[in-house]
Amino acid sequence: MDFSDLDYSDAGDSGWTMYLGHSSSVSLHHFDYHNGETKQEHDEDSSMVSDASSGPPYYCEETVHEDHLQQNTQYWCKSKSKNKNKNKKKVHEEQGYSERFNSSFDDTASSLPVGEEVSAHKQHQNQYQRFHDFCQSYSTRRICKEKVNSGFLQQAFPVDKLALDNQGGDNQRKRRG
């Protein structure tokens, strides 16, 4: 394959090389404060200039007709204004929600939830209370039914007597019912 006839393989400068070459050859004007003269220097150090691109330079030569530009701009502005109105409405709704539920004086750690969340909070509290009551009654029944081997606990809590009283109480209830 012969690469000599391809555009990007010629020895010409790429876009970066031409840009960097132009920027490095710009003449600099300095004012000498001691003599009051303006000196012109040429910076021709090309050691930092490199050809970073291997392809041909690309130039944008397309012209945009003014009519198309105006039409696109008008369409864009109209669509943006419609979106702004929707966004404003959404922001107002969100602000109203946050104002109802978040007061700057409320402490979120100690304050109760407001609105629909209150019923969920109460329901959760009720479930927790039922669980807590169940645990206490279960552990009380367990203590009453088991024999305790410690002499101190037997003196402080006559477990056998409590267990017998509870059993006797159950029998009395059955007889009444």
Curated annotation (Swiss-Prot):
UniProt tissue specificity: Expressed in seedlings, flowers and siliques. Barely detectable in roots and leaves.
InterPro entries xref list: SOFL
Query: Where's the motif SOFL-A?
Result: 14-19
Please give the biological process terms from Gene Ontology that the record holds: cytokinin biosynthetic process; cytokinin metabolic process; cytokinin-activated signaling pathway
What is its subcellular localisation? Cytoplasm; Nucleus
Chief location of this protein within or outside the cell: cytoplasm
Nucleus in keyword set = yes
As for what it does, the entry says: Involved in cytokinin-mediated development.
Annotated protein name in UniProt: Protein SOB FIVE-LIKE 6
